Amino acid sequence: MTESEFWALVTRTSPQQDQTELADALKQKLSLLSNDELRDFDKIFGQQMRRSYSWSVWGAAYVITGCDSEYAFAEFRCFLISLGQEWYDKVVESADELGKLELWPEKDGYAYPFVDEYDLIAGQLYEERNDDELPYVPSGQATPAGKKFSHKKKQLKATYPLLSAAFPF
């Protein structure tokens, strides 16, 4: 599987697409893949999850939603991946770029940039088919890359001016 094929599979149809619809669409697409392709897909997904495991990206999640747990941050990174390669690469390079995203999935009238268990779909399909798990791929570093973001409002506004304007706190 190429990275282009991977991104074609994971990219949502619109930024505000419903999370359940998004996960169902990915599951349907992945069900057509061979076991080898599922392994390749899972490997690339893991690589992208590790690539976005940084304090600067976590700081963006914090500004948008107050994201303060590893689990929520993993769901946020799944959301970034679901935006597609162009948005994903921009945000990994400069997390404040996410402030330029105009449409967001919502829950109770608030931005909800999380996709629950999007990263597990390939593994679940593989297990259903084979009664075995996908090969284990180490997750990488124990802590996010880079310098931890400051929780101080003044510093957050300076570091994430676009996001702070879009999501005032």
Please provide the spans of the model-predicted regions.
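Core of folded catalytic or high-affinity ligand/protein-binding domains
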Residues: 28-106
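An amphipathic alpha-helical core segment
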Residues: 101-149
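N-terminal domain-start signal
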Residues: 1-56, 154-168
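Phenylalanine-focused residue identity feature
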Residues: 6, 41, 45, 73, ...
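Long, solvent-exposed, polar/charged low-complexity segments
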Residues: 7, 130-169
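Secondary-structure junction/capping motif
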Residues: 18, 69, 112-116
